[in-house]
Amino acid sequence: MSEEDVKSHKIEFPCEDYPIKVIGDTVVGFRDTVIEILSKHAKVDLSTLAERQSKEGKYTTVQLHIVAESENQLHDINSALRATGIVKMVL
């Protein structure tokens, strides 16, 4: 991938419709925990909320869109979600 290709894929801030997908253990309150953390760091569009469980029910995926303001904000969101101990991956 050329430097030009990398630049063309860079996020332009603010990004009004930035998708966040959070994968974690299926536990009571997982969705609410994700929403609470995201709401502390960004404006969250709850109308985009989607939730799914893995085939065996071990993992849950919560996806929604936020207003992304900066790389630092996205880093802080990732750190806060991972600090819960129930989040396995943030995409």
UniProtKB/Swiss-Prot annotation:
Which Pfam families has this protein been placed in?
Answer: DUF493
Q: What domain of life does the UniProt record list for this protein's source?
A: Bacteria
Give the UniProt entry's GO cellular component terms: cytosol
InterPro entries, per the entry? UPF0250_YbeD-like, YbeD-like_sf
Q: Which HAMAP family match?
A: UPF0250 (MF_00659)
Protein family: Belongs to the UPF0250 family.
Protein's name according to its UniProt entry: UPF0250 protein PSEEN4821
Native species of this protein? Pseudomonas entomophila (strain L48)
